Amino acid sequence: MVASGQAGRDLGRWNAAYPHVYPLDFSSLHTPGRYSIDVSGPVTAQSPTFDVADPSALFSGLAANSVRYLTTQRDGPNVAISVLRRQPSHVQDQRALVYATPSYRRGRLVGRLQRVGGPVNVAGGWMDAGDTLKYAETASFADVALLYSLRADPALPGAQDEAKFGLEWLLSLWRAHPRRLIYQVGLGNGNGRSILGAHDTTWALPERDSTLRAAPGTPSHFVKYRPAFRDGPPRAGTSPNLAGRLAAAYALGAQVFAHRDPALAARALKAARMIFASARTRHVGTLVTATPHAFYPEGEWRDDMELGAAELALTEHGATRARYLRQAARWATAYANSRLNGTDTFNLYDVAALAHTELWRAMHDFHVQELGGVSRATLAEDLKGQIGLAQRAASRDPFSLGTHYRDDDTVSHALGLSVEGPLLDGILKTSRYAPFAQTQRDFVLGDNAWGTSFVVGAGSRFPQCLHDPVANLDGSLNGSPPIMVGAVVPGPVNASDLRGLSLSRGYRPCPVKGGNDLRAFDGFGARYEDNVVASPTNEPSLDTAALGLLAFEQAAGK
């Protein structure tokens, strides 16, 4: 025994079986080594073994695994065969035809697809999740996170090649003449009869799609010959969320590759200027994210424009830099006055935390105290409001989670908060928000009611039954290698979201013996299930892994 102590105060009721939650604080233990905790008294328990070590030693491997997950998600001819036996997939994307945004009713395709151009080469990129589709919305978010991390930590294993791979694909989506953006590759939902999409077919590895017999007019034609969907007609402008976020990714690419690959950096900067200028910021309407929109129902865009302008300001020089700095301040003000401000925290749908931080950095670097009513202090105050929202939620939860289980995307919001706290501390030059950020990260890594990490490969228990064909068909089903390391699952959701779920034929049942050994720990209306069928809790995705990368890089001190 190296230390002893008493359980903390009762934090409240979790469910009928567990009416009391008591914290165990061993933060005074600093000596590196492997430990376990023994609980004695009226209740006895023993924890799994865990490491106490330098933060870099604990978290650098998790950050590298986040990059490895992106490598696993590669699509096209240049996949990593050494990762879960991946094989080239969707090679027909090299000559994809371009289509207008189709119509949907209740999640089903209405009418036929209308061709408006092509062929275009949109092969490559990252598959968004388990369904093999590719979106500018999520791929740009992931590459922003990767490039941001690489800028701070050039030694991050595998990051340079992966960031370049993602950037090249994002550049392939922007058609300079005319100024149009491809925002999605692949059809998710067809009509279930004459036109099938990725969600209408059997469970299979991505490479299967390229081998289908799928002549024009056959139901599977668009599964093999995947459509590339264009954002609006010519001269309509680009949806501002995508214009801002892709401008940010391109500009970050220009920063990161300025010396490593000057030609790529020049292409990226040119594209960043053009797509930012193309943003449709009047009469915006429904944002373009995915088809159908319900897949990714983003509602806010001013934060994306702020982020794009801030990254351009950090990339440019002289009068051009000043112009983008004014643009960033303009959109920071617009975001602060938006009806959605104060309703969300850092995640795929709200990047204000990163945008404010990068604008603050630009103002600091260029010795600007105030611009258009925006100061470093006002940026910090806006982020304090977001963190305050989360802290109020955490005060009502026995496990101090700063988001609501019933909002879905529980893990992505927790990871976002674990990133946002240190970003705000960086602006304020304090460590005030570090403990709260650590609590959110700890929740993701196992300090939760279910006692499981939600990151594959992290901890003694983590998800084994991913809702992902690559993991399910080419990986193990018991947590031993090969596994999809670095994948992050959505985590607990509203219990009603797990009713009536099923899968098409072809999957390997997991858990092998069935059942749900974690059900006794469901509470607060939330449920977590480690089951291949349970897509709401167990389908990993790009955006959640990207947040994991940012969180683990910060925790490692990078």
Task: Indicate residue ranges for each PLM-predicted region.
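Aromatic (Trp/Tyr) and acidic
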Residues: 1-43, 68-140, 148-149, 184-245, ...
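Edge beta-strands of extracellular beta-sandwich domains
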Residues: 44-52
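Extracellular interdomain linker/stem segments of modular secreted and single-pass surface proteins
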Residues: 53-59
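A conserved hydrophobic secondary-structure block that centers on an alpha-helix together
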Residues: 153-161, 223-278, 282
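Carboxylate/His-rich catalytic cores and anion/metal-binding grooves
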Residues: 159-187
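Acidic, Ser/Thr-rich low-complexity linear motifs
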Residues: 288-298, 341-347, 397-407, 457
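Solenoid-like repeat scaffolds
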Residues: 333-342
